[in-house]
Amino acid sequence: MAYSFTEKKRIRKSFAKRATVHQVPFLLATQIESYTQFLQAETPPARRKSEGLQAAFNAIFPISSHNGLARMEFVSYHLSNPPFDVKECQQRGLTFHSALRAKVRLIINDRENPGKVKEVKEQEVYMGEIPLMTSTGSFVINGTERVIVSQLHRSPGVFFEHDKGKTHSSGKLLFSARIIPYRGSWLDFEFDPKDILYFRVDRRRKMPVTILLKSIGLTPEQILAHFFVFDNFTLQSEGAQLEFVPERLRGEVARFDIVDKNGRVVVEKDKRINAKHIRDLDSAGTKLISVPEDYLLGRVLAKNIIDPDTGEVIANANDELTETLLENLREAGVKDIQTLYTNDLDQGPYISQTLRADDTADQTAARIAIYRMMRPGEPPTEDAVEALFQRLFYSEESYDLSRVGRMKVNSRLSRPSGEGSMVLQDEDILETIKILVNLRNGKGEVDDIDHLGNRRVRCVGELAENQFRAGLSRVERAVKERLGQAETENLMPHDLINSKPISSAIREFFGSSQLSQFMDQTNPLSEITHKRRVSALGPGGLTRERAGFEVRDVHPTHYGRVCPIETPEGPNIGLINSLALYARLNEYGFLETPYRKVENSKLTDQVDYLSAIEEGKYVVAQANATVDAEGNLIDELVSAREGSERETRMVTPDRVQYIDVAPSQIVSAAASLVPFLEHDDANRALMGANMQRQAVPCLRPDKPLVGTGIERTVAVDSGTAVQATRGGVVDYVDAMRVVIRVNDDEAVAGEVGVDIYNLIKYTRSNQNTNINQRPMVKVGDIVARGDVIADGASTDLGELALGQNMLVAFMPWNGYNFEDSILISERVVAEDRYTSIHIEELSVVARDTKLGPEEITRDISNLAEAQLARLDESGITYIGAEVEAGDVLVGKVTPKGETQLTPEEKLLRAIFGEKASDVKDTSLRVPSGMSGIVIDVQVFTREGVTRDKRAQSIIDDELKRYRLDLNDQLRIVEGDAFQRLERMLLDKTVNGGPKKLAKGAKLTREYLADLDKYHWFDIRPADEEVAAQLEAVKEAIEQKRHEFDLAFEEKRKKLTQGDELPPGVIKMVKVYLAVKRRLQPGDKMAGRHGNKGVVSKIVPIEDMPYMADGTPADIVLNPLGVPSRMNVGQILETHLGWAARGLGQRIGDMLKASAKAQELRPLLAQIYNESGKAEDLDSLSDAEVLELAGNLKKGVPFATPVFDGAHEAEIRRMLDLAYPDDIAKERGLTASKQQVTLHDGRTGEAFERPVTLGVMHMLKLHHLVDDKMHARSTGPYSLVTQQPLGGKAQFGGQRFGEMEVWALEAYGASYVLQEMLTVKSDDVNGRTKVYENIVKGEHSIDAGMPESFNVLVKEIRSLGIDIDLDRY
């Protein structure tokens, strides 16, 4: 097995029993692929598929004018390069976008001869700006990173369901069908309690379904022929002869004696006809049965009956037979009649009854009835009626089933799936009604709307395409109106097209749609989870309030597609889900999951992705089925899922067709990071998965000792850890960047063979956490493509590291861990284990006001020099300044309105020229409760305003950094070129050269070394081919230099041009503060198993419980938090973590004793290769083994994959390996080595019982007490009620509500109560008086009238009731 550059530094020992045949796919693939397909920017115009932007243009163009003389055609589009890169957009508050330009052709036909083209104008037209996706699947909109969440919505198609008996009091099932298009009117069909079938369009008034059938051109005869089979009768003078159809009589009660053709009575009257009777009649060759007259009465005619002589209609189709009608028929000489065959069991007369309820006569009347329902009150003219009917379901402009919808309709109506148009067809309506009638007749099954075959995912690309199409259709309307003038006014395409509607539609979607969300950037996992989220909410989806239990519940088809664990707690539970680890979308937007093919009970290496619909056809076994070395299923019975319900049952191995690819395929990325998930209760697992997303990155990330093996995948796929895009040798490393000289075989001809990775340093995330990347390579390291070369936030050696590994004891400690509280050792704080850096952005803008411009300056009156000490001459704080609440960060003055001055003041001002009172101090200060260090300052200046020194120095630094990058590239390019030149020139004969090189001399290495490299080009080789190559290299180097100079110039232009600022803003300054947050009581912590708590006390290290060798515990947790919560995974993690720490200490002791690699190998082989997945340690060199051992000193990392993890026996074996008997005895371990005798840190006495002690990965969550704690003495008041505002953000007070008033009343504390309701709240005069009294030293209160009484009086007055208050 080949290990990557980073993997071999610290190999994670895996307990997995099953080898993976299918790697976890790239976790951001759904987002990135969807948007790539939408843009198709890299695809040449001729080869673009009709999807995304191309499909939108194709759908709207060509646009023709109303008179048909002019039309505009779409040729192609292209996206320009973005003006700023992602980082610049974030700094400047811009959108990372690209300009979309479409090439359109305006064709004008000749007026006299419309078939002849008069003029063609082709032009490229600006069509707005399209936001671009970053490499990590997010968007930068107005400087902030956002994510477009995928939407899980009901797939277009046809669906059949019933009301579950809830509508009618009798509990009768009322069946309904619904045809849902992607775009256009919904068509519903529904039965009422009287079994009449209705239809409605867009949930409007219902009408009998036969009106719709007539409107599509069917006559009542044709309608009946479609839905019924007929009984054929031949009328006799008395009674009639019925054509014998055996299956129609079975189960009926004979209303008369049934005789065969020989006259023998086969069935007596009032006897039920059974199978034997049918056989007897059949064997007797019975073709006709004589029936009495009353058997015909009440039957319904299937066809119109016309008098053959006169042509007069005697009876209409759907008429009931009566005695009179029968008489008339006989008189007219009608012999053969057809009636509808109906029964109460499986052939109901529903359509016949509906036809009776329908009073429309023909197609025209039916269409008018539909028009009146859709447009009540409007006169139904013939054209309007026809236009509306066509537009409802048959017009491609207003109705679109989409490929998905057509496929779903065809598959449900049992037709070939790919055929049919994207609008409704008459057969679709007919077949739908047929299936619905069959359902009512008890044939067939209704659909499950929560089945993932009926719900599809709309990804970013599709959502953006819909918005773009909406904007483009608005443009189409405007263009249509103006096209008529194109010829007369000689207009060009750009005169006709206004891109604003497109821009505004796109901007609205990306900026304020419910699915465009502020990216959760707390840590790499929260980023990746946010991008893999699937929401049922949003436009065209469900609403929280209306979503029932069924939609939220876990469905069997979620298996391997949607995670059953990870979903929010609260009102959104089950509506927001996460994609499972291996899930992907198919071309129709349905979720698929991979399964491994099984043939003849043997596993193959073929992996097929199946959608929920396809999976229903197969028998799929679980990944934990027992398999022998050859891949054969060896159990007699295997647990497998089969049938459309996907019920788990035991089947024989020969019936198995597929097997899961991995045990973890059922869960999402976050849930798969929880070790021993299989031992946790689902509710707690949900909390564990959710809380990992809230973990704050620590100062020094620490990989989890007990992981699941997915940590590396998440860290790399999130883009937090930097990967090498091409292999090569590390040429230069510092904290800011890594320079790699690319391998020759990976370098592209004509490109620079250098990759420069500028690392992100101390950057603020959306949640104010710190993003910082640290290089992991040194100069000379050889890296391959995909190797991790730098760690990011919460990653350690390329693995996700959300928390810290802590020595945890499960025991009570003086009540300080009551109710899930957590007791922490002072050592944890002293070692900065949970210290995190948070970056706050504070900004100030200088505006142009009516009274004059605001000014950013150091010159502020009435401020002491000490307060200005941290400002430079431009009035902006310097980097590195330590600031506290209230300190000035940026000095700013605002002009004040001129006040009316007295003559004396005017005189003084004239004499002393004092203008300070004209401006007021509006400087940016550090908000209350915040302190930190200034780590960055950015100054943005409007175009045309001169820059201050600070802004100029920032630009100079940026240019210096950029020049450094270019110089590095040039250095490596030239180095490579001169190496090649040296190989080429050595031992070549020359015609002359610098330093008096004689003709005919041969070039030596010494001569070339002595000569300045740039003078090599002055050598004149005798071989013309070598001379030509020398000249080519010279030109190539000069070309590169020229390119780099151009790039530098472009960068300089970009930096020195004015910044785009909001209207009225002259200058903007952003100051970034780094705030260090140490762990303190009140902070929330959690494990990965939903075991959360709040830090209650930080205890001195000497008071913590300690082991026999003196090692104190880091954290003490309450053991009572485990049994009732049923998250036993945390205990198993603790035991395995304890073994990991012990093994690390054994390796550390050996290294201390200067052990050689050969001595370490046997122990490493025991650890890695006794059970679980074997590791190829022999492939490592001795130096690599020693480096590996050095990284294992703090603990050997384990991987216990979800549902395929370590067993108890393996944990015990690892504990035995980590703690041989001598070490165990020395540390006070019990015989099982899972518990320890601990001593009380305060008394030194041993505790009565052994305690479970081990290592657990604990996280510090983003709920920090510093962000929540808040106190107010005085502050702002509400304008109307004059009561203090509420909330920390407003520096508000604590609400003293109704119940608190009751409490004071109950205690009789009348003065306290009076004070609370008046001077401490909204008694304006009283407040000022109290303040005055305190200043004077008088401690008395004069309570007045609270302002809220005045508000109440005013509100009552607004109702027209006058109230006066008298004071007594």
UniProtKB/Swiss-Prot annotation:
Presence of keyword Nucleotidyltransferase: yes
Reaction equations catalysed: RNA(n) + a ribonucleoside 5'-triphosphate = RNA(n+1) + diphosphate
Keyword Acyltransferase tagged: no
GO cellular component: DNA-directed RNA polymerase complex
GO aspect biological process, one term: DNA-templated transcription
Enzyme Commission number(s): 2.7.7.6
CDD domains membership: RNA_pol_B_RPB2
SUPFAM superfamilies, per database record: beta and beta-prime subunits of DNA dependent RNA-polymerase (SSF64484)
A molecular function GO annotation: DNA binding
Key words of the record: DNA-directed RNA polymerase, Nucleotidyltransferase, Transcription, Transferase
Similarity comment text for this entry: Belongs to the RNA polymerase beta chain family.
Function: DNA-dependent RNA polymerase catalyzes the transcription of DNA into RNA using the four ribonucleoside triphosphates as substrates.
Subunit text: The RNAP catalytic core consists of 2 alpha, 1 beta, 1 beta' and 1 omega subunit. When a sigma factor is associated with the core the holoenzyme is formed, which can initiate transcription.
NCBIfam families for this protein: PRK00405.1 (NF001616), rpoB (TIGR02013)
Protein name: DNA-directed RNA polymerase subunit beta
Lineage: Bacteria, Pseudomonadati, Pseudomonadota, Betaproteobacteria, Burkholderiales
